């Protein structure tokens, strides 16, 4: 089991190409890569709670949302991001079983909380990996608090610790690691740790790819 790895992906420049072609759609990139698909977003008014909505693009469906037959992903970007995580796992010698979920998340500034709801993503032994797609404010907090997966089987509400139930002034959950976004950087950590997004600055959009990987 690995506690945390923070490293750049094999070829960080591919993130620039993706963002220019498929997110920003800048003129120079359109001229060079005519026909590159643009990201299609889904608005999620309720993520961990309705306090923290976001835009989302599914790369690989969560295990419980997958159809009994057919494709687990119809995203034109999954092959691209699958290669990135596969290379990262290989380059860092990370043994694993399979990728169970992948998603592009796009969040914006919020001023009603200093971070999102602390949460875990998956009810079994897994790593969470986050690839940062742009250089903007908005850290990831990895908390010094871990879930017991047996408790998740008994009570699924324990996936999330609602932000408003925590006494952040007098009895906060301590932050073990704070990861600041850097384009092309990946952080992979033990998925039993609760984690949360921090708000980006007004006028910015924070874009990441999040993966869950069982071991």
Question: Where on the chain are the PLM-derived regions?
Answer:
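Catalytic core of non-heme Fe(II) oxygenases with the double-stranded beta-helix
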Residues: 73, 78-82, 86, 91-215
């Amino acid at each position: 089991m690995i506690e945390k790895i923070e490293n750049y992906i094999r070829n960080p420049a591919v993130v620039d190409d993706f963002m220019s072609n498929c997110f920003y759609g800048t003129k120079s990139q359109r001229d060079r890569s005519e026909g590159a698909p643009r990201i299609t977003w889904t608005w999620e008014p309720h993520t961990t709670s309705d306090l923290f909505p976001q835009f989302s693009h599914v790369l690989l469906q969560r295990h419980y949302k997958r159809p009994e037959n057919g494709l687990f992903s119809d995203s034109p970007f999954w092959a691209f991001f699958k290669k990135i995580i596969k290379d990262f796992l290989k380059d860092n010698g990370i043994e694993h079983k399979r990728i169970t979920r992948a998603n592009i998340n796009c969040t914006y500034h919020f001023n009603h909380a200093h971070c999102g709801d602390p949460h875990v993503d998956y009810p079994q032994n897994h790593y969470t990996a986050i690839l940062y797609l742009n250089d903007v404010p908005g850290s990831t907090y990895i908390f010094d608090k871990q879930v017991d997966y047996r408790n998740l089987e008994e009570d699924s509400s324990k996936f999330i610790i609602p932000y408003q139930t925590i006494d952040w002034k007098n009895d906060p959950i301590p932050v073990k690691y704070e990861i600041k976004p850097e384009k092309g950087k990946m952080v992979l950590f033990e998925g039993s740790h609760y984690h949360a997004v921090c708000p980006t600055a007004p006028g910015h959009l924070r874009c990441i790819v999040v993966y869950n990987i069982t071991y």
